[in-house]
Amino acid sequence: MERTEGWAAGVVLTGLGLRSEADPEQFARELRGTDRLISEYLSEQALAQQPPERRSLLLRLSVLDRMSAELVESILSVDDATSLFEELERESMFLVALDRRREWFRFHPMFRELLRYRLRAEHPGAATEILTAAADWHIARGDASSAIDYLLEAGSGERAATVISGCGREMLERNDTV
């Protein structure tokens, strides 16, 4: 239930998968959005129904741990990300609001895993570019912690170290950790 975050179809698909497993507990612990049953369901129900442009955008959005309209508009050249988020919520595209004002969102973890898997397969270098752009966006807004996370995920350890050394004292004073 924890991995599916209460997603009804995910719970049902997990149940189906458990039936054929020798070690059901291990299966449940290791459940991913790229598992065959879940992947097929998400692909058929969510991705296949999207126009190519929207599908491509979903793949690129999956790189972000959390996203706001301002961030998405800035780094992915989306015209009206607020409307995009509203549409994705209406279409039940596994989008989760992270705050009451509905400014920050994330994808359901299993859906995000599938999207990221597809992005790596179809556009191998895209994730690194998006992660770096997200880091730059966060640096410009004084959010070094998020920027460092994105830089490390992008494999830019040297640049992350530079950001840390540039703002390390401030982060320590605020008791902000990476």
Question: Where does each model-flagged region fall?
Answer:
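Extended alpha-helical scaffolding segments used for macromolecular assembly and cargo binding
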Residues: 123-178
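Short, polar/flexible loop-turn hinges at active-site or ligand-entry regions and domain interfaces
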Residues: 24-28, 78-79, 119-125, 171
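Short helix-capping and inter-helix turn/linker motifs at the boundaries of alpha-helical repeat units
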Residues: 33-37, 48-49, 106, 125-126, ...
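C-terminal boundary/linker of central alpha/beta nucleotide-binding cores
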Residues: 4, 40-120, 129-132
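Short acidic (Asp/Glu) and glycine-rich catalytic loops that position anionic groups and cofactors
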Residues: 21, 113, 160-162
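Short, amphipathic alpha-helical segments that act as regulatory/interfacial helices
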Residues: 1-19, 62-65, 73, 89-92, ...
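Short amphipathic alpha-helical interaction/hinge segments
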Residues: 12, 18-26, 69, 96, ...
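Amphipathic alpha-helical "lid/sensor" segments that cap RecA-like P-loop NTPase cores
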Residues: 1-37, 52-56, 63, 77-78
